[in-house]
Regions:
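Metallocofactor- and cofactor-centric catalytic cores in central/energy metabolism, strongly enriched
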Residues: 2-165, 169, 174-182, 195-234
Length: 234
């Protein structure tokens, strides 16, 4: 039987020498990678303006991506003769984003065209019609909501009969009018609906609550690639 080979331990002859793996490496690109702003922001005092917070505090992760979006909007999109398109996806108008954000941007001239899901433009009409849309909770029991004639969009609560079905009924009456009895694109369809939204706002003593109404007043076309995901298309 062969004897096992003797294992030799490795010893450093000069213990004062630094091991190779501890030697300072040559890092030719290190300076480039470390050329970004040092992360050492000053503490917030409560006196900062929003632009200062975005530029000086939003330094990393999703806050940095938000800062990039803000700077892109400020430095590029607001330049003269720049065409700005807006896309809306997800339940934005039921959450009030139409009233609070989209309408002011349209009124300020910062939107040249919109592409939205059909559902966003449909739910936008509830606001022009002054139908109730309320804050709820994602924890609500959907079965109990159904028994109480309510519908939940995550944590937004909308009455079924008094908002959804009522909007559907009005839409059915509108879409049989002569002006709709022809082939048309989605921009023309929503332009015509926007005219009705303007009138509903006026009758309800409201202003600047509907994206379709604001788009109609500003001449901003509203397209959708998915008209069938709401009553408008169905």
């Amino acid at each position: 039987m062969a004897k096992p080979k003797k294992q030799h331990r490795r010893y450093r002859e000069d213990l004062t020498e630094t091991p190779d793996w501890l030697m300072k490496k040559k890092c030719p690109h290190k300076a480039n990678y470390m050329s970004g702003k040092r992360i050492l922001p000053k503490g917030l005092t409560g006196k900062e303006k929003l632009p200062q917070i975005v530029d000086d505090i939003f330094l990393a992760y999703n806050s940095a991506r938000l800062k990039e979006g803000c700077q892109l909007f400020r430095d590029k999109m607001l330049e003269p003769d720049v065409t700005i398109g807006m896309t809306l996806s997800g339940a934005l108008t039921p959450a009030g984003l139409g009233c609070s954000c989209v309408v002011p941007l349209i009124n300020a001239g910062f939107v040249d065209w919109i592409v939205a899901t059909g559902a966003n433009l449909y739910h936008d009409m509830h606001f022009a019609l002054n139908y109730p849309v309320h804050v709820g909770s994602f924890k609500f029991d959907d079965t109990d909501l159904r028994e109480n004639d309510l519908v939940r969009i995550y944590d937004v609560i909308i009455p079924d009969s008094d908002a959804l079905m009522a909007t559907d009924e009005i839409l059915r009456d509108i879409l049989i009018q002569p002006e709709f009895q022809k082939e048309m694109g989605t921009a023309e369809l929503h332009y015509l609906l926007g005219k009705y939204c303007v009138e509903w706002e006026r009758k309800n003593g409201l202003r600047n609550v509907s994206v379709l109404a604001a788009a109609y007043r500003a001449g901003v076309p509203c397209y959708t690639s998915s008209p069938g995901d709401s009553t408008i298309g169905m």
